[in-house]
Amino acid sequence: MAASSELRLVSWNVNGLRAVMKKDPSFVGVFDALDADVFAIQETKLQEGQIALELPGYHQTWNYATRKGYSGTAVFSREEPLQVLRTIGAPEADDEGRVCALEFGRYWFVDVYTPNAQPELRRLSTRMAWDAAFREFLVGLVATGKPVVTCGDFNVAHEEIDLRNPDTNHGNPGFSDEERGSFGQLLDAGFVDTFRARHPDLAGAYSWWSYRGRARASNTGWRIDYFLVSADAADRVTGAAILSEVMGSDHCPVELTIEL
């Protein structure tokens, strides 16, 4: 087998791909500039056939929600996947297009858009069931013997350092004890938060800002977009970054470089 090579992986919640296509720079402009080996997106808000994206040199993998204009994920990869999985065994959310799991020759790549717990945590039970099923799904992929890289919008700020105003957000969606604990269980199951592993004390590093109240201008944000790797690949990570200068969505892209 050929020697491993450094891969550049990018994840971005675009909050509606059609909207980002119309912005300057457009999605394709950002995509071309970042020049990733694998580019994952979440919250495409598309139905099949609504757009035809021209990305020469990339294989396109899509997962659409049954409900129109909602959720959805996609992965654009230079390497052709050996297989693609689009469900994880979470009945209440498996029809929402939330996962694209691609098996490549050397590793698994899993793009995820985790269900939001919603105001008053009214969808928390669905969220907890999803987290448990996703954790079991990832552990199952690790058992195949290949390293696992998973990325996307996990809809949780894990620790107080991961959001600007933890004191006023305790118990809110994305910062409830249940969601934070569940994310901790995923790490305990053998996954590493790559950004925090490389930047353990870096405050003010966020990937999502509310559209309200000039939150992005004042950097009143949350870090809810992650790249996690299975423990067997942690020492292969060469870089982890948040690309906060990239506009077009209420999220910015996050990036991982890794030798696989």
Protein language model features and the residues they cover:
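Surface-exposed cleft-lining segments at the edges of enzyme active sites
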Residues: 89-90, 115-131, 167-172
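Surface polyanion/phosphate-binding segment centered on an Asp-His-Pro turn
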Residues: 241-260
